[in-house]
Each structure stands twice: as C-alpha cells, then as structure tokens.
Amino acid sequence: MALEKSLALLPLLVLVLLVLGWVQPSLGKESRAQKFQRQHMDSDGSPSSNPTYCNNMMRRRNMTQGRCKPVNTFVHEPLVDVQDVCFQEKVTCKNGQPNCYKSSSSMRITDCRLTNGSRYPNCAYRTSQKERHIIVACEGNPYVPVHFDASVEDST
C-alpha cells in the first residue's frame, strides 16, 4: 500500500523537478541591462582625481574575478540620462550592428585601462576622467542600454 502511494507521487515529483530545472537557471541570472548598470553606471560617484578609483571599482563590481577586464568605462550621470541615449542619434556599433546610439551631450566618464605588465590576480588600472559623448547599444522592452560601445570627443 505504501509502495503504491509512493509510485503515485513519482510522476508529480518528476514534474516538479523538471519545472525547477527549467526555472532555476534563470533565477539569479543577471539581465544584460543589469550587467550594463553593474559594469558601467556610477551615478553616485563623482569623478575624482583618486588614482585608485579604477582599482577599487573594478574589484567592487566583480570585473577582476578569474581575469582582469582590460578596459572599462564608468558613467557618472543619472541612470535616466544614460537610458535616454537610446532615443538620441542612431549610429552603427563597432561590431556592425545597427542598435547603437550616441549621446547628444557630453557626459562625465572615467576610463579604466589595465596597466602594462598587470596580471591576474593583481589587476592594476590607470584611471582617467573625461567628458565625452557615449555610444551605447540598446535593446529590450523597455528599450535600455545593454552594452557600452565607445566614447567620443565632441566634434565641434
């Protein structure tokens, strides 16, 4: 009798495990928009002349785990202003895709570049503050930045 009850519950258990197998990989997985924000947004941090800014931020934002990310840019503007870039001048991305947009005004950014000779796990970065137009790739609904493509000087 107990064996029959156990066998009757087996299909239900299999179904639950299948559903968990389907759902679980998406739980806790960072969306492309969330990854963009983690890797590129620092609205609260004003750009400073602190030479260790990049070393600290790259480590804090998990871009030195397993390898040293060679180049990264942080944007020091409100998130809504960066999201608005998705509705500004359309440009072609470096990889040839048509979903990049250039900001209509300059934005405060910090460029972080891995210094020569720096090797994992001792990632060391050169910090440089700039005011530049940013180019981001956008996608999704809502249409938001998912990739930082470049920064360019004002052409005027």
From Swiss-Prot:
Residues 1-28 form the signal peptide. It holds the Pfam family RnaseA. Residues 33-43 have a biased composition (Basic and acidic residues). The active site is at residues 40, 147. It catalyses: an [RNA] containing cytidine + H2O = an [RNA]-3'-cytidine-3'-phosphate + a 5'-hydroxy-ribonucleotide-3'-[RNA]; an [RNA] containing uridine + H2O = an [RNA]-3'-uridine-3'-phosphate + a 5'-hydroxy-ribonucleotide-3'-[RNA]. It is found in: Secreted. GO terms for cellular component: extracellular region. Residues 33-52 are annotated as: Disordered. Disulfide bonds join 54-112, 68-123, 86-138, 93-100. Glycans are attached at residues 62, 116. The keyword Nuclease applies. Substrate binds at residues 35, 38, 69-73, 94, 113. This is Ribonuclease pancreatic. The gene is RNASE1.
